[in-house]
Every structure is written in structure tokens, then in C-alpha cells.
């Protein structure tokens, strides 16, 4: 008797090639439902609709299609249990040898702007997870495939093993099935529960060599069923990504996402920017960012918001870099970068989309906060000094404020010509970060501006900045001693702007 395959998929990638091989090479019969059955029929493949096989029509507008004993009996029957076989025969149920199923696109639906609760609920799959769990449970007797990436491997299994998939492959596929349903249910629960419950489930993509340090095991996980963010990036060349590479790449992505209208480049070391700049071209932006702190740039992570061209590639290979990421890479640029084969070059078309939440583990649980993705708006800023900023100063203040948001607190950025020229990060007191940033800027601090991620608790930071030649400052405001800082700025002829938004980063 021919073997039986049940197919019901939302993602039809690779479906026709798979089923054609099943029919022509391995003598499978096909049963399918809804749009999947129509796709197979349109491709000229012989297929029996689930409704015809079960004798029960689809009802409730398609909500009930595969929830039937002839389906689940065929999936769950144990071939080595005589009573199970007797039950199949008495109920005219064929054993199902292969289940190919993936689920309604719930996550894609809720990601759309303006989606309603009722629209989201209609994308909660019922029959799909039931088939996926049932077939995963019974992996000893059948195979389940829930990802088009599995299709070629499955066919090769059949070709190498006289038309049978190995137990090892079936068990591995069952695990993938359970992970798929767990991730799917997690997305639904998180959506419906809002802040009351937060579940984090990931599928391991890669075992990493180690974590932050060699004695710390680490792995990389994908959340959700669809690759997004770094899981959707393409690595063009270079060694495997490390834990620290990925952490720094995300820090670089967050900064570069602040700038869309103008070519921008940032260089990251230990999650802090050692150089960030805007330019008339991406090559100019990178050179300005590199020259901002060429010593720290050695071994850095570079993010660019424009495609890598040949001119930029020639600059990139002049120093040792761990990683470079950009939306794309031109062919001649890739050839140039190939001269430094160890540098990891990645492309990620959408560098602006990041996680909506930030999660941190603590003893006994974890903390969740919404990501700091507030967009800087100069129309909401308050100029609190007698001197008003020039248009050029205001643009520079905005640039520095966007970068300062991504510097570890206490964070200070000194900038000029849309380039960071001094960065003070992670100091326990704010004036300490101010002094570090100004020392790094040196003579370039004259006529530059300074941004602070938190308010100035005393006027010492204002006076220290003025002594170095700073002409304008931007900070959140909100200190009990704001008037002391404002008074000092007025005495010294400085501009000071309050944003009303704090950007602590720990």
C-alpha cells in the first residue's frame, strides 16, 4: 500500500517540489486541506481533500477542518501495538506516515500596525498545533516537518535509507515541532496577557564558542518562528560570530538606527561608541568615525547605514576590525573586503527594527522594560538659557543627544561637525565622565557641544565644560539644582537645552 502524507501549511515555500518528489519517487498518496490542497491541485499533483477523506465537510468558516478521528487516529496510531492497528482497521483509518504542517502567521499579523484583537484571534491556529503535537509525540512511527528548511534533508533521508527516515531524524524533527508549538503559544499568551505574564522561548541557532569570557558557556537563540533581526542577517565572510560580537553588533545597530536621512557610521567597543559620525557619503562618515578615536577603533565593530561601496571597503581594510554590518555590500566592495578574510562582514537590510522589550535576568526572575526607542524631537526641547542656539548648534546638539542615548551611564558625548570627538562612559559620577570626554576631545573641544544622558546634579559639569571651550549643552533637566546649572551657563555665555527625557543605560 502507498504511504500517506498529510499536508497543511501556511508557508508554501518548497511545497510543490517536496510533494512532487514524494509522489514520483516514493509513491506517497496526498491528503490536504484548504489552500494547501488547492496549491497542489493547481500544480497538477494528485491530492485528496481532507473533507473527502474524513467524510466531514469543513465547518465554522474553516475553523474545523482536520480535527477528526480519521486524521488524528492515523497520526497517533502505534504501528507496534496490535490493538491500535485493529482500531484503525475497524474504523477504516489509514496510518499517516508524514505530516507536513506549519501554522497561521500569528506573529506576522500582530506586528502589523492597527491590527485588532478579533483579527489577531482569527490567526490563532487550532488544527495545526494539534497535528504538530500529535505527530511529534508519535515520532517513533512517522515523520513531522514544520519548516521548509527541513524538506531537502527529509528527501535525502528517504533516498539514503530505502525510502524511510531514520529514527534520529524523526526525533530531531519532533523536537523542532514541539519547539515550534511552544514558541507559537508563547507569542499568543504574551499578546493576550500583556504585562501580566511574560514568557521567553527560543530555539537554539548556534552553540557559541563561549560567552563574555572563555569559562562561560553560551548559545544563540532565535525567538519566534520567523527569522528577524540578527537571525535574518547574511554573513558574507569571516569567522563564526562570537557572543561578544553579537552583543556589540546589537549596540551598533541601535546607534545606527537613530540616523536614516544622512550617511552614518559608528564604531563600537564593549557596547560603547568610540566613534560615530555623519558624512556626505558613507565613506566620509566612516573615516570621520574612525578618526574620532583611531586607537580604540582597532578591533571594533562597525555599522553603516548605507551599502558598502568600494571606496568604503578600501578604508575598512586598513585596520583590524572584528565585524562590519551594512544594509548591503556592492560586489566590488565585497571583493576588496575579501582581502581581509577574517573580518566578519554581514548584511542586514533592516537595521532600524529592534526588540520592543529589554530583558535582564536577576536572581529569582527577570526584569522586562520597553526598549528605549523614543525619537528625539527638538520641537519638544526647552531652551533654558538666555543665549539661543544657532541652527548649526541645534543640529549638533541633536546629533550628540542621539549618540549619548547609547553610551553607558553616566554617559557624556562631546561632538563637532556631526562627529563624536570625546566620549565619557560608565563613570560613577557625572563630572568624572565629563572630564574623560573633554580630555579625549582635547583642543577640539573648543566651540564644540556636550550632551549628557542624565541631569547635572551640580553646576561643576557646566563650568568644567565651559573651561574646555564648550559652547552648548544638552541634558534632560530635572535636578533640584537645575537653576544652579542654568545660572552658571548664563554667566559663561553658554546655550543649555533641556530635553525632558533621560537616557540611562546600564
Region spans (language model):
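N-terminal glycine-/serine-/threonine-rich phosphate-binding loop
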Residues: 1-53
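ATP-dependent carboxylate/acyl-activation modules
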Residues: 2-7, 98, 104, 184-506
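Anion (oxyanion) recognition and catalysis
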Residues: 23-24, 41, 125, 136, ...
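Hydrophobic beta-strand scaffold residues
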Residues: 30, 47, 142-144, 345, ...
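Glycine-rich nucleotide/cofactor/substrate-binding loop typically near the N-terminus or early
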Residues: 35-106
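Active-site/ligand-binding-proximal alpha/beta "capping" segment
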Residues: 79-126, 133-135, 381-391
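Mobile "lid/hinge" segments at catalytic clefts and subdomain interfaces of large enzymes
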Residues: 131, 138-154
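Non-catalytic interaction/clamp surfaces of large macromolecular machines
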Residues: 149, 153-200, 208
Amino acid at each position: 500500500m502507498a504511504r500517506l502524507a498529510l499536508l497543511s501549511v501556511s508557508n508554501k515555500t518548497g511545497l510543490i517540489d517536496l510533494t512532487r518528489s514524494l509522489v514520483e519517487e516514493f509513491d506517497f498518496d496526498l491528503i490536504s486541506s484548504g489552500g494547501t490542497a488547492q496549491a497542489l491541485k493547481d500544480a497538477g499533483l494528485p491530492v485528496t481533500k481532507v473533507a473527502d477523506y474524513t467524510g466531514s465537510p469543513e465547518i465554522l468558516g474553516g475553523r474545523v477542518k482536520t480535527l477528526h478521528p480519521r486524521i488524528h487516529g492515523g497520526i497517533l496510531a502505534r504501528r507496534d501495538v496490535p490493538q491500535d492497528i485493529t482500531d484503525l482497521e475497524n474504523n477504516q483509518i489509514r496510518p499517516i506516515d508524514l505530516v507536513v504542517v506549519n501554522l497561521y502567521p500569528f506573529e506576522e499579523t500582530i506586528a502589523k500596525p492597527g491590527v485588532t484583537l478579533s483579527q489577531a484571534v482569527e490567526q490563532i491556529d487550532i488544527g495545526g498545533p494539534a497535528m504538530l503535537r500529535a505527530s511529534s509525540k508519535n515520532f517513533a512511527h512517522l515523520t513531522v516537518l514544520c519548516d521548509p528548511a527541513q524538506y531537502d534533508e527529509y528527501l535525502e533521508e528517504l533516498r539514503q535509507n530505502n525510502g524511510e527516515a531514520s529514527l534520529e531524524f524523526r526525533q530531531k524533527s519532533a523536537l523542532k515541532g514541539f519547539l515550534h508549538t511552544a514558541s507559537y503559544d508563547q507569542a499568543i499568551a504574551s499578546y493576550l496577557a500583556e504585562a501580566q505574564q511574560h514568557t521567553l522561548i527560543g530555539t537554539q541557532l548556534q552553540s557559541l564558542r563561549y560567552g563574555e569570557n572563555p569559562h562561560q558557556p553560551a548559545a544563540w537563540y532565535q525567538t519566534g518562528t520567523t527569522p528577524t533581526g540578527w537571525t535574518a542577517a547574511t554573513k558574507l565572510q569571516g569567522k563564526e560570530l562570537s557572543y561578544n560580537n553579537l552583543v556589540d553588533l546589537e549596540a551598533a545597530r541601535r546607534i545606527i538606527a537613530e540616523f536614516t536621512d544622512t550617511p552614518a557610521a559608528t564604531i563600537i567597543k564593549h557596547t560603547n561608541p568610540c566613534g560615530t559620525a555623519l558624512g556626505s557619503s558613507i565613506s566620509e562618515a566612516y573615516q570621520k568615525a574612525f578618526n574620532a578615536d583611531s586607537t580604540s577603533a582597532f578591533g571594533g565593530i562597525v555599522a553603516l547605514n548605507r551599502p558598502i561601496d568600494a571606496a568604503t571597503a578600501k578604508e575598512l581594510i586598513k585596520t583590524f576590525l572584528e565585524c562590519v554590518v551594512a544594509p548591503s555590500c556592492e560586489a566590488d566592495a565585497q571583493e576588496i573586503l575579501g582581502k581581509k578574510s577574517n573580518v566578519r562582514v554581514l548584511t542586514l537590510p533592516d537595521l532600524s527594527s529592534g526588540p520592543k522589550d529589554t530583558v535582564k535576568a536577576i536572581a529569582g526572575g527577570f526584569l522586562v522594560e520597553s526598549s528605549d526607542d523614543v525619537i528625539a524631537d527638538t520641537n519638544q526641547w526647552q531652551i533654558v538659557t538666555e543665549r539661543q542656539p544657532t541652527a548649526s548648534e541645534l543640529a549638533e546638539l541633536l546629533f550628540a543627544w542621539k549618540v549619548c542615548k547609547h553610551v553607558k551611564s553616566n554617559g557624556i558625548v562631546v561632538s563637532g561637525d556631526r562627529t563624536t570627538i570625546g566620549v565619557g562612559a560608565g563613570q560613577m559620577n557625572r563630572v568624572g565622565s565629563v572630564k574623560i570626554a573633554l580630555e579625549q576631545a582635547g583642543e577640539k573641544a573648543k566651540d564644540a557641544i556636550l550632551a549628557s544622558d542624565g541631569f547635572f546634579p551640580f553646576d561643576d559639569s557646566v563650568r568644567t565644560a565651559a573651561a574646555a571651550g564648550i559652547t552648548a549643552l544638552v541634558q534632560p533637566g530635572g535636578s533640584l539644582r537645575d537653576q544652579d546649572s542654568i545660572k552658571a551657563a548664563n554667566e559663561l555665555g553658554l546655550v543649555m537645552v533641556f530635553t525632558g527625557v533621560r537616557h540611562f543605560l546600564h
